[in-house]
Amino acid sequence: MNKRSWFIPILIVAINVLAIMMRWCSLSELLPAHYDLEGNGGGTMPRSVLLLYPLIGAAVCLVAYVIARMKQKLQTGLVILASGICLVLLSSAMVTLTAGTMPVFMLAEPVILLAAVAGFVACVVKSRKKKKAVISH
């Protein structure tokens, strides 16, 4: 299995950690829990919740890596899916770090997730077609 392909999702998680750490000291203890498209915050959450975003991203990468070790034909699809999920988590962190002033991050999340799922499905379909072609010969 090509371990270098996991560089991209791990890099995304690292960027997420770096972005949070760069802003950590300037963040108040309580942050808005969500924003609307005009940047108005609502609800509150402790800033420590931000640490969950890269941890969840790393967990997603780890689970995808373990599954890919078992099903090597799905490796590319799992890397795409893990990268997409990590990008969505990074986008969520960036919405909070920019105090909701950059709604492009919120708008990008469904597009990123849809593209990641589509990429994963395409890889699954492709691997099944190869499997059927091998069986029929």
Language-model-detected regions and their locations in the chain:
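Short, charged juxtamembrane terminal tails flanking transmembrane helices
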Residues: M1, K129-H137
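N-terminal membrane topogenic signal
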Residues: M1-L11, M45
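Alpha-helical transmembrane segments of integral membrane proteins, especially early/N-terminal helices
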Residues: I8-A19, L78
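Active-site and channel-lining beta-strand-loop segments
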Residues: M21-L51
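Membrane-associated feature with strongest affinity for ZDHHC
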Residues: M22, P46-K126, I135
